[in-house]
From Swiss-Prot:
Residues 21-104, 152-235 form the RRM domain. It comes from Lachancea thermotolerans (strain ATCC 56472 / CBS 6340 / NRRL Y-8284) (Yeast). May be involved in the modulation of rDNA transcription. CDD domains: RRM1_RRT5, RRM2_RRT5. Belongs to the RRT5 family. Keywords: Repeat, RNA-binding, Transcription, Transcription regulation. Transmembrane segments: none annotated. This is Regulator of rDNA transcription protein 5. GO terms for molecular function: mRNA binding. Residues 109-151, 271-291 are annotated as: Disordered. The gene is RRT5. Pfam families: RRM_1 (PF00076).
Amino acid sequence: MSPTQPNPAAALSGSAEPQTKRIYISNLDFSTTEEELEQFLQEFRVVSVLIPSQTVRGFRNSTVRPLGIGYADFASAADALQAVENLNGKQLRERTLKIKMYVPYSPRARAERRKEKRKVPAPQAEENPDAAPQDAQQPQPPAPAEEPTSKDTVYCAYLPSKVTDVELREFFADYQPQDIYVYRTNGSRRKVYFHRRFTAALVTLGGEAELANAIETLGTRRLMGKKITLRPARLSKVEEVQHAAARKLELEQIQQQTRQIAEHAMAMEEHRQQEAEIPAAETPDDVAATA
């Protein structure tokens, strides 16, 4: 089921009343179905449920693997908020769910938030400008704003090119790994003509303590024989990767539907041609005329 798109402006507004009717659910068990999740949410007038998945293409075959996340739309924004308040932290299939209001990814809104964080008011001199110290008359350059980081998600850089979520889940097994996103990104160095692609991943762990312990303990270890980099993930990167994964899934579903329609049309055309090639049955008059 494809949920309707919420209003981004309303979802990003700072009003006390929630505007979006959609919620975001993570840490789902990979075997959870949309029917089970809808049953889990039915008390709050759920309208539609979507559990994204991705197609992993191998040399001989392809497998469909859920992303461990889900989206749900409700009859009203109040129902969505009640679902978050009552079900966040509850268990489904022995997995503790993380549920929050859905906020659409918006590069423009993120840029505006960064711009606001960098704004630092210039120091104002007192009523007598001559008596103000020299340092107070010269505005100080704003300190670079640190981008907020996640409290439970680790950013893994410079991973082996063939790594999958299976190896990462085993690598972080002692720290309750949950959502795992593996992706390829472009790397570059300023003032040097050097570009390369490297493999990175975002791994959501059990909590803040697990994140700190994993970085401290695993930061010096090798994964598949390669030294990697671990640090807390930026919240903007987490949102970007999650929405990119969801968008990729939507495109794959559209392509699959297009292929199915084309295959059906081709089959119908072949059937029509075969029917046209079958000779018509002879009537008694035709038999008599032949005799």
